Amino acid sequence: MDDVVLRGASRDYGEGAGVFDVDLVVAPGTILGIVGPSGAGKTTAIRLITGALDPTSGEVRVLGHDPRRFPRATRERIGYMPQLFTLCPDLTADENVDFVASLFGLLAPRRRRRVREVLQLVHLWDERDRRAGRLSGGMQRRLELASALVHEPSLLLLDEPTAGIDPLLRRTIWEELHRLKLEGRTLLLTTQYVTEAEGCDVVALITGGRLVALGAPEELRRKAAGGDVVEVETDAPFDPAALEGHGGIRSARSTGLRSFRVIADDAGTVVPVLDDLVTGAGGSLVAAREVRLTFDEVFTVLVEQARADQAAIEGEADGATDAGARDAA
């Protein structure tokens, strides 16, 4: 059974705000990252999965249940880290995590061990006696994460778990997330750091409230580029257009007087034969290497494509409306 299933799930706030017609299936033991521009609907999607929001239409199932009606045993299998600080500001860091652990029924010996483990993980053990309200914003984020992890849930829903956290600690947290995955746990997280998508098994890109891309990081990279990308340098000006259609080359475009970029079905097949292809077209190859788009580039291309597609759809709809009005007149 899949841990999380959304079928045509929507939450419509009106005036184009919300999430719309989201189809998503998350298998056990998967890290799924939800990325997108600010205001794209990432947090709304997470809150639908937690049951904090009701879908306007469609269906949401989590661990086999409607999240609005979780049995207690199912709820105890879930850890949730909200985007905003929700713990008690008047309790210490230690007391907050201990209290959350007690809510999930952890008995004293195990509870004390787990509280120490998670506070050490997020580098807050030395701050355990400080009131939560006196911690910095970044420390409060880490305290929320510790509280979400303390009862060792099988499903973790993390809204911006590394926001406001320094790069070294982000790496430590990601190491822990991957360790949890290896134990068979399922993790859904949103992130403002697009490069963190590389650490996910599956990436869901949301923009304008719509799921516009879903797949492994490499799949999204190929989708954005149109295939594998190879950068080529020649010893003299060369028109690469003659290479298109040969040896699995989809397109070849100049990037300078003596350089061009190839989009290929398979870079591993194309690179070894490029010398012959360029020579046969009257050129001389200096170097050829496969390059990988950064995830910032992937994100930008896919978002721009989605916005262009949506604008085209809206333009067609407006045109049909105008035509109908003229016919009626």
Task: Identify the function of each model-found stretch.
Residues 50:
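Helix-to-loop junction immediately C-terminal to a conserved catalytic motif
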Residues 156-159:
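Catalytic Walker B motif of ABC-type/P-loop ATPase nucleotide-binding domains
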Residues 90, 131-138:
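Conserved ABC ATPase signature
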